[in-house]
Amino acid sequence: PISTQLILESMRCWALELGVDGFRFDLGIALSRGNQLKPLNDPPLFTAMGADPQLSDLKLVSEPWDCGGLYRLEDFPAKRIGTWNGHFRDGMRRFWKGDDHSTWTLAQRFKGSPDLYDGKPVALGRSVNFITAHDGFTLADLVSYNRKHNLANGEDNRDGENHNNSWNHGIEGPSSNPLVQTLRRRQQRNLLSSLLLARGVPMLLMGDEVGRSQ
């Protein structure tokens, strides 16, 4: 199809002419839909990517969900494409926030999420683990706010996710309280350590290492 050809030629241009060494597909599982939006197990685009020698060395990452409700983490139809593990994000946030019944989930995520991959630890490169991303709270915001505050963009706080598994540690927003500051810094280190030590590929949001807020 012409759309597949356009995507492949665009990737080759970015990779060969401009030196880009990897691509991320936002809502990428949508690319696996066929006629009448039916999910395919062997999508032509992913098959063509795998067979293209000029794209074989690129790093490929995808979101395993789309706007139509399709979610295929454990059976994403392209084994060489790493997939964002949203269960890792949610499980780690809940554990370090102190939610009940979150310890078992923490253990599963540390071991490579075998509960999501037929009882086996995920193959290296398949699970892209993350705590934060470009959407939503940064790491510093995650430990500083119980709710979103998207007021400056004129959307009246209607945009963005409402369910963030965040915890402000007693004070909403910036605080000069030394005890709150100490606890927030500790929690950021806990979350970062969990990300870096768990089995899988860690994805670190730029700026989280220095406490950036947005």
Placement of each model-derived feature along the sequence:
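Short, acidic/polar
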Residues: 2-17, 187-193
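Active-site groove signature of glycoside hydrolases
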Residues: 8-34
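Conserved alpha/beta catalytic core and glycan-binding cleft of carbohydrate-active enzymes
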Residues: 19, 32-35, 40-206, 211
